[in-house]
Regions:
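A short, charged, amphipathic alpha-helix used as a generic interaction element across diverse proteins
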Residues: 50, 91-96, 100
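Well-ordered, non-membrane alpha-helical segments in soluble/globular domains
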Residues: 45, 84-94
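An N-terminal amphipathic alpha-helical segment
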Residues: 1-82
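A general, composition-driven signal for non-globular sequence regions
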Residues: 2, 12, 20, 89-91, ...
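A generic structural signal for ordered secondary structure
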Residues: 64-66, 95, 103
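Short, charged/polar micro-motifs that form catalytic or ligand-binding hotspots
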Residues: 80-88, 109-111
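C-terminal edge-of-domain segments
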Residues: 97-124
Length: 124
């Protein structure tokens, strides 16, 4: 209820104005969440592809990244990194996207930090 009174604009009538601005606020929040999801998905895909290429050049078949990795945070951004490790929908989408190309992506919860492990069987 407090949120509704904060969002009320004087241009609207009392009841209709509150309802209208609450709906607008919900839409704005939904749009922000969708944009964050898309932005994180694209940045994470690009970052993981770069890491796959680097690991493959060294003859490795997997790599692991910690949630507090400075390079990951710089590449994705703070909000995007948090979204990556806390959004199960985003994790499912990343797993699905990489599975098509033969990569296995696992998100693991640790005691102090989370991890993402990407592995593959054949030489990349």
């Amino acid at each position: 209820m407090e949120l509704l009174s904060i969002l009320r604009f004087p241009d609207y009538s009392m009841d209709g104005g509150r309802l209208m601005t609450a709906l607008e606020a919900k839409r704005a929040a939904d749009n922000f969440n969708q944009e964050l999801f898309k932005r994180t998905l694209e940045k994470a895909t690009k970052y993981f592809n770069k890491e796959i290429e680097e690991a493959a050049c060294q003859g490795s078949y997997e790599f692991c990244i910690k949630s507090d990795n400075d390079y990951l945070i710089m590449a994705l951004g703070q909000k995007e990194t948090i979204e990556l490790f806390h959004s199960s929908d985003l994790q499912k989408e990343i797993k699905k996207r990489f599975r098509v190309d033969g990569f296995l992506v696992n998100f693991e919860k640790g005691y102090e930090r989370d991890y993402v492990r990407v592995s593959w069987r054949e030489p990349y």
